[in-house]
Amino acid sequence: MRRIIPILTFFSLLCGCSVFNSETVSHRKVAVQTYSLHKYTLEQTLEILAPMGLDGVECYPEQILSKSMPDARITPSMTKQQRDYLKALFKKNNLKMASYGVCFGGSEKGVREICEFVKDFGCENVITEDREDLLPVWEKYAEKYGLTVSIHHHKKDNRNRYYDADYLSEKLKNYKHIKGNPDIGHLSLSGIEPMYYLKALSGRIGSVHFKDQPQFGDPNGRCVPLGEGILDNKAMLAELDRQGYEGYYVIEYEEDVPSLIEDIQKCVMFLRQN
């Protein structure tokens, strides 16, 4: 950990001491999916991300809480002591749990426990890829706890059809509290035009995993800093602005790269300046 912070500090100095400047765009809410730093504990992750001026983080279920609590994962099974420790970490680093996922309830009991868990942290958005027969259950508890449930999708496969914008859009018409969670990277990996997906879900987007890639349709593609790939991120931002989207723009890296922390900070800068 002692080796990471000086590197981040140096990079911040190189960029002008902060990710903010006079050209920043203040209306975008920017978060980082903590899976991007899955090799670290959540405590370390929050310390790394704190200087970047984020609005929050999207926590994923299986990350270890702290080296001092190696058996604690970010799940509803956390004890009160563990939860209090995490709440103190959020306060210390001036961050919050903006969203939680990707998670699977698996049953009504599981859905209820997840909703109770995130509400305890003041989180308002759950990201799930649960099976379709559980969507009415998610709607029930989202209404009870004042949450938005955003349906995620991975690459095009046989698990579900959530990657199909027209199909998901039709499903979402049945629910008030359930929306879509477009993952720009997974759409590109599947050869699905991200802009089409965003337009098809217009007004029904609860969260976005915002990414860029060096090639479109490459199933083995990797993320690159926003604005440095071939995806038209600026046009997608304009489309989301047109829709009046007010949710989080969640930065996520799913592969380990040597420049990971620097790349994440570049993504934050891009979202602040465009």
Where on the chain are the PLM-derived regions?
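Histidine-acidic metal/acid-base catalytic patches
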Residues: 18-34, 38-56, 92, 108, ...
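Active-site acidic/histidine proton-transfer and metal-coordination neighborhood
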Residues: 83, 93-179, 188-191
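Metal-dependent catalytic neighborhoods of phosphoester/phosphodiester hydrolases
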Residues: 68-72, 108-112, 260-261
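Active-site-proximal loop/turn and secondary-structure-junction residues that shape catalytic pockets
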Residues: 36, 61-63, 103-106, 132-134, ...
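A short acidic, helix-capping loop that chelates divalent metal ions and anchors anionic groups
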Residues: 65-72, 151, 158, 189, ...
